[in-house]
Every structure is written in structure tokens, then in C-alpha cells.
A protein has these predicted regions:
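Short amphipathic alpha-helix that is part of the acyltransferase structural core
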Residues: 1-26
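A conserved beta-strand-loop-helix scaffold within acyl/acetyltransferase catalytic domains
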Residues: 17-43, 49, 57-67
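A structural microfeature
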Residues: 53-55, 131
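A conserved beta-turn-beta hairpin within the catalytic core of GNAT-like acetyltransferases
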Residues: 63-74, 130
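A short, internal acetyl-CoA/4′-phosphopantetheine-binding micro-motif in the GNAT/acyltransferase core
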Residues: 73-84
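Conserved acyl-CoA
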Residues: 87-103
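Conserved beta-strand-loop-alpha-helix junction that forms the acyl-donor binding cleft
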Residues: 105-118, 137-138
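C-terminal "cap" of GNAT-fold acetyltransferases
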Residues: 118-119, 123-138
Length: 138
């Protein structure tokens, strides 16, 4: 897990969300319960040749009352290696299909230098642009 912290630091400092930073300790504590990990939070990571993890992708089972559907919703996707990151996504999608999710939601952060490239990647995979979020400090 500590290897992944390096990815959080890079994302938070240079490419992260506007005004907000990933809180790695809170994320770990929030999803440490075994019941949540079995039913509602799904995580895959890539172990690089050097013995360190260089990528992570996680999804939540969004039991969305607004749409009346369970949606396989991206929680976080961080990767130093785009090839490994793509394999993580492929593994996650295969899992979602096996579990009979009907929908998947992926996101991209506007501040990320590859945001446009990621959006084109999603569109090539058949994803449709759906909504845009705005954030402000109160």
C-alpha cells in the first residue's frame, strides 16, 4: 500500500482535483471493512518488475437510487505506467461484466495533463460524455 502513496502525492501536487486532494489515510480507513471490500468496493493494483506497485484502480458499487440501477463507478485510477493502467481497466471491466453490472462510469480530472487524451480513450471504448462537475470553496 505504501507504494501507492507515491501516486497519490504526484496526483495531488501536480495533476489533481481543483481545491481538493486525495486523502490516502481516510480512503484506507473508510474501506478497510471486509464486508465493504467483498460487496461494494473493488480494487486492482499492478505490481511492477521492481517489486513496487505502480498503479491502482478502484470502483464502487454505486447503488444509485436516482436511476434505479447498480452502477460500476470509478472511485480512483492512478498509474505511472499507461500500459499497466490499461490492463487494470480491462481487468476491472471484465469483472464488472461477470458480476452483471449494466453500466460503468469513468471520470477524468480537468487539471490532469492527459485529460483530453483520456477522454478520447474513453470515447474510443464506447463511453459517452455525460456530465461536468464544478467545485467551489465555501
Amino acid at each position: 500500500v505504501s507504494d501507492i502513496f507515491e501516486l497519490f502525492d504526484l496526483e495531488n501536487e501536480k495533476m489533481g482535483h481543483a481545491l481538493l486532494k486525495h486523502n490516502k489515510e481516510y480512503i484506507i480507513n473508510a474501506f478497510a471493512d471486509k464486508a465493504i471490500l467483498v460487496w461494494d468496493f473493488f480494487v486492482w493494483a499492478n505490481l511492477a518488475e521492481n517489486g513496487k506497485y505502480d498503479g491502482i484502480i478502484a470502483f464502487v458499487n454505486d447503488k444509485n437510487e436516482k436511476f434505479g440501477e447498480q452502477i460500476f463507478s470509478e472511485y480512483i485510477w492512478l498509474s505511472k505506467n499507461s500500459r499497466a493502467g490499461g490492463k487494470l481497466l480491462g481487468t476491472a471491466i471484465k469483472f464488472a461484466r461477470k458480476k452483471e453490472f449494466k453500466y460503468i462510469i469513468m471520470n477524468t480530472v480537468v487539471n490532469h495533463p492527459k485529460s483530453d487524451k483520456i477522454a478520447r480513450f474513453y470515447e474510443k471504448m464506447g463511453f459517452l460524455r455525460d456530465s461536468i462537475s464544478y467545485v467551489a470553496k465555501l
